[in-house]
């Protein structure tokens, strides 16, 4: 008898849990109520640890992994998720440029010569380049790519390994490189090449075999991609062996010499991004909107299987920020942090205007003129 009662109770609990999950997943009203009152996803500025900054110091901030880094007055300061200083590193940087991958943070003096690679909160190596740094990239293995200008060549592309040892250099005499990315396994480096000498600007993505670049440099470029529509290529990012490519007319996947367009960017799309790990996202006004009721759809697409998730936004979007597996949708004084499943992770509300947002894997920085608030994701 007791066994039957126990089985009945367990069965009832399973049914209740299944119904609750079904309502949460399938009913947006239930999900919003649960997020706010049960899961406590709504956060206010008074709830967050704060880093005080001086507006006159022109402090620049960047979140990576579970840290937040600031650069100002030739000092790189790294904070933890509680806004406590972990370490400070002397640097020579006027205009910081940041890139990150996993636990690695790459910081360069944009237009200058100095480059620094950080792992967690420790300086791995630093270099003074011969030329001006225009673009940088890193991968999860600590490999680094740099585009240099201001030499006898229009662009020089350099790759370094995790120790800072140079892997190879590629020189461009008549064209310029505008972006660079390294595959997860460090076997390939791709770059965007722009030709401006003709009547029409031409853009291509070229993929270099790192092994061939070290042994037979003349044979190192194994793929050259141009879009079918000859659109302008703006940005690239690797997902395994796929080169995810942001163009002015859409987002393409380049792989093994093939071009697949997975998103068309038209006047209906107000924002799009490829910075997420393995996903792309876009924001467009929902169909059937009226003057009194405006909704926007955030669509998140997996670049491997093309599966798509949708998150509904209830007001006008001011800006979009993406990194790792988190999307931040800025609505002015409110920010909705959404994961790649299309679910709300956190909702932040401020009484002041937000200047900027930076997102790491586990933390985000809400940037104001005089302070940075650190939000744990």
Language-model segments: which ranges?
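Sequence/structural signature of beta-propeller modules
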Residues: 1-50, 55-56, 377
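A short beta-strand motif characteristic of beta-propeller blades
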Residues: 41-53, 82-90, 121-128, 165-171, ...
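Intrinsically disordered, low-complexity segments enriched in Gly and acidic/Ser/Thr residues
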Residues: 254-349
């Amino acid at each position: 008898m007791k066994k039957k009662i126990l089985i009945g109770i367990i069965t009832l609990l399973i049914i209740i849990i299944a119904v609750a999950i079904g309502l949460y997943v399938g009913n947006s009203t239930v999900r919003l109520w649960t997020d706010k009152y049960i899961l406590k996803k709504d956060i206010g500025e008074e709830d967050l640890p704060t880093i005080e900054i001086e507006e006159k110091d022109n402090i620049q901030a960047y979140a990576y992994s579970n840290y937040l880094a600031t650069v100002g007055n030739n000092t790189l300061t790294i904070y933890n998720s509680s806004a406590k200083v972990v370490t400070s590193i002397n640097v020579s940087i006027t205009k910081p440029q940041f890139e990150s991958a996993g636990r690695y943070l790459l910081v360069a003096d944009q237009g200058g010569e100095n480059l620094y690679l950080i792992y967690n909160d420790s300086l791995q190596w630093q270099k003074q380049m011969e030329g001006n740094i225009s673009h940088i990239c890193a991968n999860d293995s600590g490999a680094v790519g740099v585009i240099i200008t201001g030499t006898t060549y229009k662009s020089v592309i350099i790759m370094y390994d995790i120790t800072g040892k140079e892997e190879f250099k590629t020189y461009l005499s008549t064209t310029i490189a505008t972006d660079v990315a390294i595959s997860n396994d460090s076997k390939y480096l791709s770059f965007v090449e722009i030709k401006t000498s003709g009547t029409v600007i031409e853009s291509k993505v070229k993929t270099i075999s790192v092994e061939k670049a070290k042994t037979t440099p003349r044979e190192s470029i194994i793929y050259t991609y141009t879009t079918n529509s000859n659109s302008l290529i703006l940005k690239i990012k690797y997902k395994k062996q796929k080169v995810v490519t942001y163009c002015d007319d859409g987002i393409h996947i380049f792989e093994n010499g093939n071009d697949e367009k997975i998103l068309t960017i038209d006047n209906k799309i107000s924002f799009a991004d490829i910075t997420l790990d393995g996903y792309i996202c876009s924001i467009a006004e929902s169909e059937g909107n009226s003057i009194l009721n405006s909704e926007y759809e955030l669509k998140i697409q997996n670049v491997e299987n093309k599966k798509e998730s949708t998150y509904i936004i209830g007001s006008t979007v001011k800006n979009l920020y993406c990194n790792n597996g988190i999307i931040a949708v800025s609505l002015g004084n409110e920010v909705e942090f959404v994961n790649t499943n299309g679910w709300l992770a956190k909702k932040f509300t401020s009484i002041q205007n937000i200047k900027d947002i930076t997102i790491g894997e586990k933390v985000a920085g809400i940037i104001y003129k005089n302070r940075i608030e650190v939000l744990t994701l």
